Amino acid sequence: DPMNFKLLINDLRFDTTNIKYVADVSIATISFDPKNSELQDAANKLVGWCRSNGMALNTKKTKELVIHFGKRVDKKSIPYIVINETNIDRVESFKLLGVYFSSDPSWSTHVDYIVSKAARRLFVICQLVRAGISKCGIVLVYCSLVRSILEYACPVWHCGLKKSQSLETEAVQKRCLRILYPDLSYANALSITGLERLDERRESIVRKLFNQAKNPDHDLNKLLPHKNSDTYKPVTRDCYPYTIPKARTSSSGHSFV
């Protein structure tokens, strides 16, 4: 029973970040020295907890994802996590709650995944057009069946997209509108259907969530950067109210970490 399991794992307590969702548990930690990670200690505690509660950890379904920025990092030199005398598989990407995280870090794997999945569903749009369904109805189906895939959890990954990746997602919507209005330009088709560009919609969603998170009572408020000390200085283009961490590369500056 997933509900009983969720209640059972609620007493898991580690010094790491724990993500618990129904029948899944994910453990994350930050390490400046990859050779001295806290994950092995956390894994040992998890194994002990499982034994105490009459359960066994499935090592075949357990994966390790090492996320790093430096090009000089030799992942082969990083010790594998060992559970029950078995090395845990180390993967280049992993899907967590529907979003692919990669070791680069980048969003290439996730973008490829959502674009491919959404593009396959355009077949349904073609069938509806052939069946003579109204275009208004088809647009509703598109928003529910296709666009929802391209926007799922976008506050996590939108700001880290490259321009080419953003265009990849936009191309799916362009194909859909070309099926409905083959003689119109993309801009005119957007105007007629009342749809927005996907990048503009994602930007709006992200800004809305960010404004909500600025409320001290919001669950995500603790994840925001520290505010600048000079709170009386007016907010201008050159004066941002939050302290932004410095990044040496564009990939680290736009990553999810």
Regions found by a protein language model. Name each.
Residues 1-2, 31-39, 52-59, 87-89, ...:
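Conserved, non-catalytic sequence blocks in retroelement Pol enzymes and Pol-derived host proteins
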Residues 1-16, 106, 143, 147:
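Conserved pre-motif C helix in the palm subdomain of viral-like polymerases
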Residues 12, 23-25, 43-46, 50, ...:
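Mobile genetic element proteins and their domesticated derivatives, centered on retroelements
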Residues 41-42, 48, 56-92:
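Short, conserved micro-motifs composed of acidic
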Residues 47, 51-66, 72, 165-232:
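Short, charged alpha-helical motifs in flexible N/C-terminal segments and linkers
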Residues 224, 228-257:
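Low-complexity, glycine/alanine/valine/leucine- and proline-rich hydrophobic stretches
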